[in-house]
């Protein structure tokens, strides 16, 4: 597993000018975080993770792919406001839409970071690398394919420092019905 981006020993006056696209498989990452945290109310903290992933490189695009139509409007607004990102609802799995978007971006960016541990992306990683794109994976280690990690140029481990847990919502009370 590659655990160094190479920036640790870089002289201070050297600036790496890379354009980065981040593609998030929301369902895969959410499920991995919920399993690792043991809590369905745990959520990815983009404000800590995105700067860590970028490592002083420039963010070109951010896409969050998620199955289903029930996507938080707060998440949409936050990603758009802070990262000019967009949320892409998917009919079923995010695999195909994320792959298509990655192929469209391949000649527009230097690096693509895929936030998913799904082995379905192995062939995509291989293809992007043949196109000259640096491909990095960010995921929860326990839910990540070792083959995907081996094929990538770099692996970022998503840890408990990269998510937070919301308190559970209190149950909604039904109004008391007055009897005549």
Short names for language-model regions:
Residues 68-180:
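Nuclease catalytic cores that cleave nucleic-acid phosphodiester bonds
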Residues 2-96, 104-107, 134:
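Domain-level signal for Mg2+-assisted phosphodiester chemistry and nucleotide/NA-binding surfaces
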């Amino acid at each position: 597993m590659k655990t160094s981006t190479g920036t640790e020993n870089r002289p201070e006056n050297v600036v790496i000018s890379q354009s980065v696209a981040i593609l998030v498989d929301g369902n895969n990452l959410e499920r991995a975080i919920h399993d690792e945290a043991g809590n369905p109310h745990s959520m990815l903290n983009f404000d800590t993770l995105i700067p860590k992933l970028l490592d002083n490189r420039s963010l070109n695009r951010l896409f969050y792919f998620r199955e289903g139509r029930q996507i938080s409007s707060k998440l949409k607004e936050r990603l758009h406001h802070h990262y000019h990102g967009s949320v892409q609802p998917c009919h079923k799995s995010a695999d195909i839409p994320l792959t298509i978007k990655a192929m469209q971006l391949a000649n527009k960016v230097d690096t693509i970071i895929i936030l998913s541990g799904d082995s379905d992306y192995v062939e995509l990683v291989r293809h992007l690398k043949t196109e000259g794109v640096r491909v990095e994976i960010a995921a929860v280690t326990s839910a990540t394919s070792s083959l995907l990690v081996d094929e990538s140029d770099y692996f970022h481990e998503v840890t408990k420092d990269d998510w937070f847990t919301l308190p559970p919502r209190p149950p909604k009370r039904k109004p008391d019905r007055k009897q005549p």
